[in-house]
Design a protein with these regions (language model features):
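Sec-dependent bacterial lipoprotein signal peptides
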Residues: 1-19
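Glycine/tyrosine- and acidic-biased, solvent-exposed loop/turn segments at the edges of beta-strands
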Residues: 2, 20-222
Length: 222
């Protein structure tokens, strides 16, 4: 989960007043959480063959580590659902013709987070992560973290869309202050903060801003 503390720039309409940024100085944004899970107990692939004495046809199998529901043949799940149980999470995979669908995986975490998307030896690829507080992220993941391009929306409907690195806003992106997206800041972000030159839009007015370590140091009207 990311929390945002830095507030909106005030809309400034008089050029003579454009000598500084809003008094609502941006603060840091909270750190995100890693969404990795321990797969040391049993691998996804070996779970499909780790059963014995299951009748052919439709049925189910369950032990302490995993559960299968669907059609079985020769002690293998041919079509159905494979569910793996870990100490911190539950993983659900679809199986078709003995093949696991790694593009549509569901992960439910004990802390209330939920992930749906691709799986490559963990949460990697494209997916959607929802947090128990109402925040959500949709985009690229690598090694259980937000990496690549994606959109993070807070429960108050503010959103950031752009580049991510190791669960932080890094690179080019746009931060929308509210749901109607009429007020936003577009530019470069570094470690969850605006950095360098960015363009601020508010009520059809456009401003050029300069940022240093999340603090707006200069603003001018275009």
């Amino acid at each position: 989960m990311i929390s945002k503390k830095w507030g909106s720039l005030a809309c400034l309409f008089v050029v003579s007043l454009l000598t500084a940024c809003s008094s609502q100085e941006p603060n840091d944004i909270h750190q995100t959480q890693s969404v990795t899970t321990d797969l040391s107990d049993i691998s996804v692939e070996t779970a499909l063959t780790a059963i014995t004495n299951v009748s052919d046809g439709k049925g189910s199998y369950k032990d302490d580590h995993f559960e299968m529901n669907g059609t079985f043949l020769n002690d293998k799940l041919i079509d159905g659902v494979l569910i793996l149980y870990y100490t911190d999470s539950t993983l659900t995979f679809s199986v078709k013709d003995e093949k696991i669908d790694f593009d549509h995986v569901s992960v439910s975490f004990e802390d209330g987070e939920n992930y749906k998307g691709q799986w490559e030896d963990g949460i990697s690829g494209k997916g959607t992560l929802t947090f128990k507080n109402g925040d959500s992220y949709e985009g690229d993941f690598k090694n259980g973290k937000m990496n690549g391009s994606g959109t993070y929306c807070w429960k108050d409907q503010a959103c950031y869309t752009g580049s991510w690195k190791e669960n932080q806003m890094n690179g080019n992106g746009t931060y929308f202050y509210d749901a109607d997206q009429t007020e936003y800041l577009s530019g470069t972000f570094r470690d969850n903060k605006p950095y360098g030159k960015a363009t601020y839009f508010c009520e059809n007015h456009k401003y050029t801003t300069i940022w240093s370590d999340g603090v707006c140091t200069k603003i001018s009207y275009e």
